[in-house]
Amino acid sequence: MAKKSLIEREKKRQKLEKKYQDFRHSIKKKIKETSSLDEKWEFQKQLQALPRNSAPTRLHRRCFLTGRPRANYRDFGLSRHVLREMAHACFLPGVTKSSW
């Protein structure tokens, strides 16, 4: 189980990313559209003035149940440990153990 403080920190980052998402997207679009280096420089300054945690690259996928930050399956939102346990307990419909 991950520390609750780390899980809360990740939630805070998700809120910030959602809050500044449209503004960040519009600035990046303006940077691509302008040809003047001075204007690009000003837009880049605006982009750098945004909070660091509002960048989407700062987000990290975590397990829905345990909060584990590594070895997550996107399809289920679970870590490999929880996925294995739930698959063996038949809590995930359609998931079968492979056999060849």
From Swiss-Prot:
One of its GO terms (molecular function) is structural constituent of ribosome. Keywords: Chloroplast, Plastid, Ribonucleoprotein, Ribosomal protein, RNA-binding, rRNA-binding. SUPFAM superfamilies: Glucocorticoid receptor-like (DNA-binding domain) (SSF57716). Disulfide bonds: none annotated. Pfam families: Ribosomal_S14 (PF00253). InterPro entries: Ribosomal_uS14, Ribosomal_uS14_bac/plastid, Ribosomal_uS14_CS. One of its GO terms (biological process) is translation. The keyword Chloroplast applies. One of its GO terms (cellular component) is chloroplast. Gene3D superfamilies: 1.10.287.1480. Signal peptide: none annotated. It is found in: Plastid, Chloroplast. Its main location: plastid. RNA editing decreases as the tissue ages. Part of the 30S ribosomal subunit. Belongs to the universal ribosomal protein uS14 family. Binds 16S rRNA, required for the assembly of 30S particles. This is Small ribosomal subunit protein uS14c. It comes from Physcomitrium patens. The gene is rps14.
